């Protein structure tokens, strides 16, 4: 039968249809996905004959999915497109060269070199006039004078080398980051049904017609239409701006859109649009992902004088973006607000980044001052010597000669500046981070934001989940309470009556996600594989242990027959499924935290399988005799129950009425063993000065038992264990607001937060970060796996998401993904983070020594000899050594266990410690003494001609060649000294493990030999004899001996030494700058300093920000940041027939986590989660069972004291003491023991 829609297809669509051999075209599907609710249903039913018929047109099976035939998949990609957003083309090498040329100091040096080059060819009339000053006059010197152009050319050549090296580094960095980006994209997979099998497929390989399995926590990778759903709720705020979750069902609204988040429930959808044809892809295209086209349009608009009355896209609070309709009052009002808008605080940069920028500004100021002073003194010296002392007149024919001198002085000054400015600093940071990130992958840390790597080195606290992180996430049922009997081991199925066994099997098999399965082991003799939710897998394993087949039950009751599903969420803490009874009526199976489910039970099955009354007293006895002993063994307790309904259908939306009067079938104890390596890892954290806190949804007894096994709690420690409710009661005032002062009294001793919600976790993390208690501010790392962990992961300094158990939303919010979900991987991240910090410090120690010596030598030489002993080209070579090569050598040191034996650095600890300052000044002292002796007495010692006060264009001298060679060799050996920055004696320790370091030092030494022996005039060098080389080498090796002497001097005795490179302290922040970050304070200092052109130093920030090319996902804020904010969206781009509603588009959903969408290929990465936009306080969602609190007075009376591990009583109200041995704990009595125990699934 022909469908009506076949007759209304446009001609071009029919052509496409015939070409693709599908019953619908790309444009038809695009238009279909723009519809919502009833409109969409009408279109699907009227024009396509329902979802089933649409699947037929797309040649796919709603149950089996696509066959997976490669030819069919390729055909679908050709017709409907790939599920990727075309990335922006990477910058070409020439573009990177052009960017490197923009450096201010290099530009000035280039100009000076060109002037020098031009003047060298100019032969003024008065060149041979003695009144014009000291010029080469001998025949030999005249040849040299004619070769005066060489110096200018050599400087230009050196600049070209520096530029090419910089561009190559940038190119290789971008290439590496794109490689890392591809790795992240490969990690993003989605559940797809193909050929009847559920497989995990990379999102870029999804095609139109695929059947996708949708579940809680997923980030939808493509547009689709719902085929089957269970209590499905979607957060569409990323597209519509609507903050409420949207219920999706077959009869109301089946449209699922890419970039939206599954907040609840599960289901299946048929994919209808991918890539640029999906709703997210269309909007990204409109917003200008293809910047080149936008730029062309803007240029044309300017040429044609087009008035700019298009829409403005504005960012707000760094997280939200809103596009207003044309000429709307709302848009006008917002424009007015924009005019009055105050600068919004940006997200705080990393600790190291802020310190580096601040230090670079300080060094830059000092370098600029010394450079200007050098030029001034050289000119002053020249003027006084020629026009005052020698009383020479200023002759017109002498002007070009004087200009040549001035240009030479200027070149020397600029060269001093080039050496002084720490240009290698950003390179060292980037190399160190990139190297660390690459190596961290092998340690199961997939770094999404590069700065998180070094921030982890500063971590002072880790708030860790329990399940899967501290434990193995290999759950098994080991105890059960059924029919009034507590089974300490799994019983034989023969002990149960058939009807009881059926209730257990059905209650578990039906009331679990059908994606949770137990599969045979991969290797013979291995453990069965658990797929899906681990708690549900434990229950399914219990069914298997009872010799029953859960799959047979599911085949009898397929997902399509489930009448109503109340899926698990952080509010319900339970899951319930309703099915129709064959004999009429309904049956509902429920499972969840034992305390919550038992509170809703009024009957329980006895030994005979009969339902008997279950009173409050019975419930309390059960808690005391069954649940508490299980919890003290570290078991999670889950209750299974059911309820029958008659034929009269109740109001299923009234959960409080539905989820009552249950009959308890069983309570099971689930074991999740502690990972064997975790106690040792936590001991290392304690040694490293890092406090580990466990934040879990389990009850207090289970949490305390696990924390004790892990080593978080030890007997005798004065630490707190609190439940979420008690925690909130202690930190909030009468209005329910969190008070920092109250929180500051709790968190220092808090070690376990049990029965906590995601909001509690966020409150704790925010409180610790914002706290000013203690000597240093805390740097907090957090682990999370659920959708609701997004706010805490965002707030934390470093957010760790679980790679295996984590939802897409949690991964999008994280900085690092733990690919093995293991706590020990976090400890490795700490090691790498500290190693990055040490690598930067090593480089700083080395570079600042070079800076100090080179600048002082040039300055002093200028003052005394009217020339710099180190020539411009030589200094550029030194600059190349200490920038590119040294950063490569010192930034690639592998970490060692000794890094964990030190305390965290903290936010305000300086980059340059007093020990480092001792090393810098000590080695600078040695080098300066040697250089000055060589400059002023070297010719006598070596019996050679002096190179001081050489005339203009004079040939290179052996004297100054020895000075240059000795200087470079001292830097090479000091590079070995710089490997150790904490006063260690053995600087060669582990040197052979770092092949890069050895290669760089050896390579630099070989290059130095070639420069000295064959460099000639361009490098101002002449060849040296063997004895001169040996002397230079001996003085260089003296650096190592001198280093031993310096390390023997105790730093404590040198109290006059000061530290440098602090972060911004509170006292330094003015009132109007409180919202700004470290970078902003550094920039404000620059503005005060009136050194506008010196803002080229911000290359450091720019180069560190190459991190952004590596970050995953994208935000529209990132898209728009690259555009001129005055540029409006061209509404004409939107076809009237497919008008996209963008009135509040993407409101409160676009975030900073990822800033450059053009680096992303997968559309799956394009949206981040609206929950990440955190207000100062998050409203706490009340739990269902909180409404059933019998008496608030009893509750407060119940929690009166906290018992510490050493038995000491504190005034904190807490129902859950911290005693390790549950049998010795005197629990306070109350009407209901359940008030002390609340567990989450």
Curated annotation (Swiss-Prot):
Residues 294-318 are annotated as: Disordered. The modification Phosphoserine is found at residues 13, 328. It catalyses: Ca(2+)(in) + ATP + H2O = Ca(2+)(out) + ADP + phosphate + H(+). GO terms for cellular component: basolateral plasma membrane; caveola; ciliary basal body; cilium; glutamatergic synapse; intracellular membrane-bounded organelle; membrane; membrane raft. Its EC number is 7.2.2.10. It is a multi-pass membrane protein. The chain crosses the membrane at residues 93-113, 151-171, 357-376, 410-427, 841-860, 871-891, 912-934, 953-974, 994-1015, 1026-1047. Residues 114-150, 377-409, 861-870, 935-952, 1016-1025 are extracellular. Mg(2+) binds at residues 785, 789. This is Plasma membrane calcium-transporting ATPase 4. The gene is ATP2B4.
